[in-house]
């Protein structure tokens, strides 16, 4: 699937029905160039496999809950690459259990991983290129996987950048 969009590339939203707004990707090849969000799910975005490239976007992945269990992902966001936020839920998180992720963002007040809640990384290989790698309002746990930020492997997640701990938005 190749998507070029002036707004969101792939979008699953429904503000009024909590049983909707889910996107699950289990395989295939997806390429997105978007003027706004690359792939957005109002409630939950789950990636279990596939090859996903988001070469242009404001935010490559956006949702209330973002879970990455596998796949080969190469994503770029001019604002935040992976953004978990919500105006209606307090259960907000980014969870990475597997996969091969290459995550990059533009310069300025931008974040590779931005959660208005929690960040959990327990597996996978993550290569981040960013001025600010992690921004979160809740807790952050790194219990497995390999995470490299600007060429340096890290063993714990700390909030970084000018908006650390209180950033992100819907």
Question: Each PLM stretch: what is its role?
Answer:
Residues 1-170:
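A composition-driven surface/loop motif
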């Amino acid at each position: 699937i190749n998507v070029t969009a002036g707004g969101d590339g792939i979008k699953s939203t429904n503000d009024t029905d909590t049983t909707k707004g889910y996107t699950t990707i289990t395989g295939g090849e997806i390429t997105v160039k978007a003027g706004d969000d690359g792939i957005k799910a109002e409630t939950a975005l789950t990636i279990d496999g596939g090859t996903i490239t988001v070469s242009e976007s404001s935010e490559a992945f956006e949702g209330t809950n973002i879970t990455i269990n596998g796949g080969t992902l190469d994503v770029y966001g001019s604002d935040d690459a992976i953004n978990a936020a919500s105006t209606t839920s307090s259960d907000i998180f980014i969870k990475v259990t597997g996969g091969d992720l290459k995550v990059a963002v533009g310069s300025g007040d931008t974040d590779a991983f931005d959660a208005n809640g929690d960040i959990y990384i327990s597996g996978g290989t993550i290569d981040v290129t960013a001025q600010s790698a992690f921004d979160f309002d809740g807790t952050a746990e790194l219990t497995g996987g390999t995470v490299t930020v600007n060429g340096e492997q890290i063993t714990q997640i700390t909030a970084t950048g000018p908006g650390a701990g209180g950033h992100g938005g819907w």
